[in-house]
Amino acid sequence: MAKENICIIYGGKSAEHDVSILTAQNVLNAINKDDYQVDIIYITNDGAWKKKDDITENVEDVDSLRLEEVEEGEISNLLTNSSSGQPYAAVFPLLHGPNGEDGTIQGLFEVLDLPYVGNGVLAASSTMDKLVMKQLFAHRGLPQLPYVSFLRSEYEKYQSNILKLVKDKLEFPVFVKPANLGSSVGISKCNNEEELKSGIEEAFQFDRKLVIEQGIEAREIEVAVLGNDYPETTQPGEVVKDVAFYDYKSKYLDGKVQLSIPAELDSEVQTTLRNMAAEAFKATDCSGLLRADFFVTEDNQIFINETNAMPGFTQYSMYPSLWENMGLSYADLITKLIELAKEKHVEKQKNKYKID
């Protein structure tokens, strides 16, 4: 049987650029190259698109994926011309953060009518924006912790009023987050007003909108979701930290985080978490994959924290580990995601685009 053509896209104009490259290395080394002919497209920090065809060997040096010697190409040509001359069975965007995980590149795929792995424009954009995501969860009745959100322009004009609002509505510690970033980039844990001001300034370096959330003493529990219209969920896993805050460095660089899979939880709590993860998936009209993150208190109160529409596939990642625990290997998970992308594209072709 002939190999299917797959294009993996990574890098991107985002603060999570390096995380994306790590994810690409992991996927390239795990994908079944007997079944797929794999081309890669690297998007530089400046937005240039560079392509390398027919990757047959594992990638040992992650920096080799930066494709510094490759010339920039025309985007539409790169996406529509595979190394074999056949159309791509699917493109696999491994882009994290703005300009990749937020619906922008998904819109490009839709315009070009390409099958692609993961969430569509609506789901990607709504799960990327923490405020919109929280509003959709509230509409679905999913329990959340109190929060405050505001724009950079509002803070510049009404700083004292906003700080008062935060102190009136929330108690220290609080977490300050850019609304449109993941991997804990730009996030600060703040224990007092001075740290709050500093955290706000830090977050506004990455986004024009931020969310400040109530801190809580709780376990951090995550559930993986996979599917299209009828999603499946995993047993929950737990993030066990050697640090006070699970930030970018501890996630990807230091290895100061351990994953406990499955998490030690009552069966009733596990069932509730899995049901809530599926509800979160449906609330934002997801397809392909999603990771849902929760807080579980000592007395088993459950709060949804956020969802991640493109969880990383690095060696520290929870998402593939949760499916491994369910009996689905990393390579088979990648294959399943490609099949879901093709399924979603076939479903889309049933739509009429003209009136007879």
Curated annotation (Swiss-Prot):
Signal peptide range in chain numbering: none
Enzyme Commission number: 6.3.2.4
Annotated ranges, domain ATP-grasp: 134-339
A Pfam family the protein falls into: Dala_Dala_lig_N
Cofactor binding note of this UniProt entry: Binds 2 magnesium or manganese ions per subunit.
Binding annotation for Mg(2+) 2: 306, 308
Cofactor(s) this protein requires: Mg(2+); Mn(2+)
Family statement: Belongs to the D-alanine--D-alanine ligase family.
Name this polypeptide is given: D-alanine--D-alanine ligase
